[in-house]
Swiss-Prot record:
GO biological process: mitochondrial genome maintenance; mitochondrion-endoplasmic reticulum membrane tethering; phospholipid transport; protein insertion into mitochondrial outer membrane
Gene: MDM12
UniProt free text on domains: The SMP-LTD domain is a barrel-like domain that can bind various types of glycerophospholipids in its interior and mediate their transfer between two adjacent bilayers.
Compositionally skewed regions (Basic and acidic residues) per UniProt: 83-101
Protein family: Belongs to the MDM12 family.
Protein name (record): Mitochondrial distribution and morphology protein 12
Main location: mitochondrion
Region feature Disordered, mapped onto this chain: 75-101, 209-249
Disulfide bonds: none
HAMAP family: Mdm12
Localisation: Mitochondrion outer membrane; Endoplasmic reticulum membrane
Provenance organism: Cryptococcus neoformans var. neoformans serotype D (strain JEC21 / ATCC MYA-565)
A single MF term (Gene Ontology): lipid binding
Amino acid sequence: MSLDINWSLLSQPDESATDQLSESLIALLNAQLAEAHRPSFIGPITVTAFDFGNAGPDLEVKDIRDVWRVFDQGDDEGDFAEEEKQREKEREERDKLRNEALKSSLDGERYELVDRYSSTEGTSSFEYQPEYDIHEQHGDDYRIRGRRPLSYTFGYPHDRLAVHRSSSSRSFIPFPFDHPPPALHIPSTPGLNPSLVSHPISARFSRRPMSIAASAAPRPTPRRRPIEPSSTSPSPPAHPAGLPPKVSSSSIPSLQLHLRLSHASDLHLTLLTSLQVNYPSALFMALPLKLSITGFQLNADIVMAYSGEKNRVHLTIVDDESNPAHKEDKQIPLGQRLLSNLQIESEIGHADAHVLRNVGKVERFIVDVVRKTLVDELVFPNFHTVAL
């Protein structure tokens, strides 16, 4: 089955739309060429002009079948590689944040008497409460001052309790002859845990660094009010029972087309680059090079597969040995069989000084590079995938 392509629609009747399409293709080609690997003696490559020409391709549909499994497997490998790169990047960021958090200078480390029942971690905002000052019974000047994190309460707005750091040289290490501080008596308030009052202050507070105390303090087990069974009802299931999970897919089914392409094109493509001499130093000399492709002859068997599940198109070229023309030209290299003719016009040098035109060796070299790239990148088992 043959397909008729109206190639003239690319240039008529709206030329402005054709110009926009050409500009978008030029921008796409320049973006791809900027990332492509090139030899050290070839400078940056830039596309400056593009024209579709008037001659269109001849397409013949040979077969329609299911998508080859190799396309989906190769696509999954590419997805897994991208996901692994993303996970590695996230892992590096987490390690970096963890290392920065572990960095701590012992010089100037502050010590606080931290309540081991406190659920507040790593806060540095404190409030002084003079109404909770407690004097020892033997006339000692040492006092326990009301200092607590602002975010912690006993269920009462002013129940904040901590121990102030002493600015004197008195040691906080307990000795046998020291008198223990009296237990703190807090008035009865609703919602206050009696266990917090039953322990003396010396048993509820410990002297440790703030960074260590926040991580080492055990958290109190929250009390949960039992819920009556009659007051709640089971939530509906996320997916109805007995039905398979919903699979997102495109409305277009997956299919694969085997096409025979024959294209004697008269398109026009202009590229600018340079020939660089890197001896005795880098970029010791550079010669401007202008290449103009004025036509080519392409004969190939193309496989185009569409994956409706992932909405992607896979494209590759196959070497069909059953083709009679290929049997006669078996001694010809594959690249030359696919691209039998490529017309190139070359200019080397500056236009305002001296220019060498149609240098045969340069043109043959460019043709060989194009054929080799075509075989290495598009001939099966190599293929390109386009995400729509």
